[in-house]
Amino acid sequence: MPLTNGRQSSSLGAESVVASEVSKPAVSPIPFLLREATLTDAITILRLARLLDSINLPTDKSDLVALIRRSQRSFRGKLKTRQEGMYLFVLEEAVTRKIAGTAMIIAKHGTPESPHYYLEMATDQRYSKTLKTMFRHTYLTLRRSIDGPTEVGGLIVDPAFRQYPAKIGKQLSFLRFLYMAMYPDRFEDEVIAEMMPPLTDNKESLFWECYGKRVTGLDFRAADKLSTKDKEFIETLFPSIPIYTCMLPVEVQKQIGQVGASSQGAVHLLEKIGLRFLRHVDPFDAGPYYGAKVEEVALVKHFRRYRLVIDRSGRETDAGQNLLIGWEGSKGFCAAQIHAQPEASVLFCPAVLLKALHLKEGMEVGAVPFL
C-alpha cells in the first residue's frame, strides 16, 4: 500500500504470515541474515505480498518500489523530518539468499496530514432500582490522533520457514526493537502494534459489515483501499457518538479486540517483551492495538553496545548468551541472531562467526537478548 496514508487493520502495521514452498537452507554458521530492504528485493517481496492477499505490503509494484525507496531514505537519514521515517527489513537465508520474511517500523503513526483513527473501548455501568439489575456495557468511541506513536508492523513470515530452529519470526519481531534501541532519536516515546483480527474465509470483516459498511456504503476491501489514499470519509461519515456493542450481533461482539489465528504467535512475542492490549481497536475490522512506552520494552531495557573481539579462550561452545546483534555495514544496516559471550563492553565471538557475517574485530555492534 502507499506509505503516507496507510491504514491500520490489514495495513503495513498489521502482523500476519504467508505461504509458499522453499527448500531447506544450507548449513551455515549464521543460517539467516536480517538487513534493510533494497530495490533488488522488490520482486520477491511483491510475491510475498500477493500470496498474503491483503495490503500488509503493497501488491502494486510501483507502490512497493516507492515504499522501498522511502525506506532507503529513512535508513540514510535523508528525510525532511524524522516523522516521515518508514523502515522496511527483510530476512534472507544466508546461502541461497531466499527472502523468508519482512518486518517494518513506521516512525510516526498519526500526523496532521494522516491522522491515526481508532475506536476506544470503555465500559458504562448502569443500575435500575426497579429491576434491581446492574448492567455493564462496552462501548466504542471514534478517536483521532495527529501526534501518534511509532508503530511496528509489516511482519510477514513464510510458513515454509516457520519450523526452523532459527525462529525467524521471532528474529524479525525483535529486530524492530533492536533498531529502535540503536537509533532512539528517530522514533517516538511510545510504540504500538496492530494485530490482525479474525476474518472470514473470504478475508472479510464481520465487524465492518455491521458497522463501517452501514455508515459508508462501501464494502470492506473498497474502504480499505480508499483509506490508503484518503481518510476524509472516516472523519466525516463514521459516528462521533459512542456505539454500544450490545447492539451488535453476538458473533460480532465476540470478535472485537480479538486476535486472529495467524497473529497469535506475534501477540505472544509482543506480550513477552512488555506490550499490552491498549483497549483500542481498528475502526474497520476491530483488530486490537498493543503498545507500551519504548523505554519499558524489555528488549530496549537490556540493550547494550559491544566491541567485537575474537574468542581465543577455547571455552565451551554452549557458554555465552543468545543475542540479536545489529551493525552498519558497507551495504547498510544488518543484523543476525548469534551465540556469543558478553563481558562488560566486549563481545567475544568465534572467528568463524565474524567471518560468516563479514565483521571485523574491533567493530561496534548493538545487541539485545534473544529471550
Predicted regions mapped to residue ranges:
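Extended, composition-driven regions rather than compact fold-specific motifs
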Residues: 99, 110, 144, 187-334, ...
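Internal, well-ordered domain-core segments that constitute the primary functional module
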Residues: 146-163, 172
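Short, charged beta-turn/beta-strand-edge "cap" motif at the junction between a beta-strand
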Residues: 369-371
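Short beta-strand-centered segments at strand-helix junctions
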Residues: 337-362
